[in-house]
Amino acid sequence: MKTFWIKLLVISVLLNFIACKKDTLEPTDNTTNTTNSPNEAANSWVYDQMKEWYLWADLLPEKAKTDLTLVTGKDGENDIKKYYFYSLLNDYPNTDRFSWINENITDLTNSLGGVSTSFGFTRTAVYLDNTQTTVGFFVSYVILNSPAEKAGMKRGDIILTINGTQIDKNNYATLLASTETATFGLGELKNGAFVSSGKTLQATKAVVQNDPVHFWKVIEKGDKKIGYLVYTQFISEYDAKLKTIFGEFKAQGVNELILDLRLNGGGYISSADLISSLIVKNLNTNNIIHQDEWNANITKKYTSYSTPTKFSNQANNLGTLNRLFVLTSNGTASASELVINSLRPYMDVIIIGDHTYGKNVGSITIKDASKPVRWSWGLQPIVLRTKNSKGESDYGTKDGFTPNYLVKDNIYPYKPWGDESEPLFKKALEVITGVTIPAEVTVNARRSTRELNSQVLELHESDNPDLKLKDMFVSFPK
């Protein structure tokens, strides 16, 4: 049997898995071409794939009872009465709020790998005034080597205008999408209000590869050597870099770890399993990380898919951690949640921040395998559910994991990564050391941040919609 590498992209959303499964796996294609409708052949193919792989395949209606004349689908579309793919989903968008389709398989696979055409930054959009008219973009993340970073943009910047246009409630969702080159008008906090600083940055969209191993450092506090890692997406191409960082942590004697997953919507399950193996206390390759539940058809045909995934032998495993601190947001999803759930049976996992997204299921990428290719659709249906070594998988609701310490990430502008007054990081340090850290540390002792309790319109949103994924997924062997 050929090795089947399961990858989990946790999203979001994106779910990718560790290389642990064996069996030859290819999408079946029993589609009968018809000429009754321009959509019927593609929809018939979509149905056959869903009947084979979909986690809730037993709940699908008979193909003859579906409307094969519907438009096949649209990425992120919610109108199940109009689009065939979404009409098949189980109780969409409630029970299955995760399966999706993209009209271009290349765009789909690129997004799962963190590749996009974008400026390369993530922002939170918040109303700045009581009338809820003016909006500010607070930059939370800038991709390394992206056009935004090269232009000088950084976490903590405030964007008030784009190409001279004030951001407001009517245009905040469209200004970035409608321009290839943008001049960003920056703001500052002055006398309690966010006003123009007179500074601008200019950038042009380009193909960007997200480097998810974004920031790390070691902080010494008494007898505590605290490793801090900002990890934004589970992408297997960066596994070697991840191992290297943990090697540095181990060499420096790290005995506490803060894993910042607040911007991590998912990724390869293989990378989630790798980081679990680097973190777990008393690493034992006979111990189970997680087990995957597939539909009855797949479980019968490919028995090894339900074989539990076990920890891998990692030379840079930290070894002696008694606990793990995870920083979270509502966008912490799928593969990120898999790490939390997988490690809980073996060590204390302390969650600081907000409720996580709530995604305990994973998907696969399916494309037309015929020669020549008949259509460019890419399907990303949910095909499995994960549970940990104790059989636990109870976080798959919209409440996700409940934090041990609920800390709102609503102090703007955002503090730099590793700043000890940054709210979530600050709380983790306080729990670790038992010492209270001042709410803010500035040179002139004046407040340079402001808490905003007004409505958040977009939380940690990429400037490219294709990177909104919160998913875990399996890929077919090459």
Task: Enumerate the language-model features and the residues they cover.
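Bacterial Sec-dependent N-terminal signal peptides
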Residues: 2-40
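Extended, small/polar residue-biased N-terminal targeting/export presequences
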Residues: 38-42, 47-136, 181, 187-213
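Terminal peptide-recognition signature
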Residues: 46, 121, 148, 156-159, ...
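PDZ/PDZ-like domain segments forming the peptide/carboxylate-binding groove
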Residues: 114-161, 165-168, 236-239
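Extracytoplasmic
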Residues: 116-118, 134-136, 153-154, 179-181, ...
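A mature extracytoplasmic/lumenal domain signature
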Residues: 125-127, 141-143, 164-166, 188, ...
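C-terminal, low-ordered peptide segments at domain boundaries
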Residues: 163-254
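C-terminal "post-core" interaction segments
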Residues: 228, 233, 237-244, 248-249, ...
